Amino acid sequence: MSDPRPETELHLAAPDDTARLGRWLAACLRPGDTVLLQGPIGSGKSHLARSVIQSRLGRPEEVPSPTFTLVQTYGEGADEIWHADLYRLTHPDEVIELGLDDAFGRAICLIEWPERLGRAAPASALRLSFSQDGEGRRVVLTGSADWAGRLSRIGGFAHA
């Protein structure tokens, strides 16, 4: 029996490739989607989130890393995006204090350091795992069965 969780692996040779992946991902996202961005400091998580946010907003909005604010929100209604950096959280219950539990399911949520979510991580989330790959980055995209159709179109990114 095959694994129902689709997985795609990409090599991102340069920061421009990370930004391009962010633009591709922005076009695939829908309200209620959560993207978990996992990887070491400096691996491209914030860069990708910035590209997703700017692409969804349709303008070059300043998108600082939410390392100290923990959460930044952009847009409203169907265009609402939550960008969270959970590095400084010490307990999964703090997610509730941030309001993320309310945002899951209605807004697009981009979550850095998702391991801090514990069991609060949405089962339907798309996980992007970043790692160093020579001079570039390797990113593995893993999603629930809901992501299978969208991830099958990743070839459009890989060959663009």
Located regions from the model:
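P-loop (Walker A) phosphate-binding loop of NTP-binding proteins
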Residues: P40
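Short phosphate-coordinating micro-motif centered on Lys-Gly-acidic
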Residues: S2-D3, T8, P92-I96, D101-A160
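Conserved lysine of the Walker
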Residues: K45
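Phosphate-binding P-loop
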Residues: A26-G32
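Hydrophobic anchor at the beta1->P-loop junction of P-loop NTPases
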Residues: V35-L37
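N-terminal pre-Walker A segment at the start of P-loop NTPase domains
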Residues: S2-G22
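Short beta-strand-centered segment that lines the nucleotide-binding/catalytic pocket of NTP-utilizing
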Residues: R59-Y74
